[in-house]
């Protein structure tokens, strides 16, 4: 419905499909596919050669990004803080030409300081409460406490701040969570943009809904909003959130 790359199987074991075993295809929610495509296609100014997935594990979005980067002649750095999850990312990228993607194990919060202004595109698929996937994982509600939102929101701010420092002027950062909670979504985006503006790093929020409409066979229900929120009951996806910011100074 909303991912131009999706194939819906009504039954069977996906693991028996050769393309999935070879990592040429993967099992992923359509919402996750769409936000990764938005990250790959959002309009930027200037070169489009260096891409970064700041929180790449377990690798579904990274694989899609890497394939898109290879098609465009760009290179993807897939960063993941967990060694185990970094291994999953390497497995997910097996079908991508090795010179087009590289996996690194490190803390994404450090990249903005260590490599300022290096990247043209950055995806921040931030750790979150996962409240947007309750339709598939209803038991997750019992593993979360109200205080988790506050803790994760601070981490999300740090990661988005790092991403905006790592992207060059004219480049774009796509911020994604699998949560509809405002404390993890729009408030993070606006707070970070406001804080960095005080330090002289300016951004503009691009219209993620317009990018989604251009890509999706059927526009998402919330495509009229500049920050895109998907919904299970309207879009048939997890409740993914997506915002696109372009660095202007």
Where are these regions (language model features)?
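S-adenosylmethionine
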Residues: 1-249
